[in-house]
Amino acid sequence: GHFVALLEKESDEDSSLFKGDGVEHRQPQNKIPDELSDFIDKLNRGTLDFKVESKNISVRDSYVYLCSPLMPELKGLRTMRTGLLLGELKKNRFEPSQALAMALKSCDYTDVISLPENDERVVKYLKGETLDLPEFENNTSDGWNLFCVDGYPLGWGKFKNGTLKNKYLAGWRWM
């Protein structure tokens, strides 16, 4: 559930003890892992309305979040999520999240595979199958690709040698 607290100031005498704007701002994280920084570079080469900066990245356990630059330090507070889930760090690799795919436009990421809605491979993608996409082999780089239908993102796939390994969220797949 959600909880709310009302804080009430007792007197004006203690106000001289506070300096600044009263908000403790987040300190930059330690160095971002290489596998994550490569992915962030691809995001920043797209046409995002903003740049993803390392100071706005928060890593909790293995989950990577993009936080608002205005968000204060949350040290000591229990939070479910601290921003947009970018993905997860797993065994020396980064896997982007479905939430990130849904938050992007096709022009926001550099490696995009977009098919028309009437292509039979769209249904295969929605069912979680691996796709053969030989026509994208020369103009798409290997690695994480944003899979789109008519320019609208559906999810992620890992592209290599003309094959797209489906990373569509398992709970969303067609039966």
Feature map (PLM): residue ranges:
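Conserved beta strand-loop-helix elements of the APE1-like EEP
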Residues: 2-12
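Polybasic, low-complexity RNA-engagement segments
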Residues: 10-175
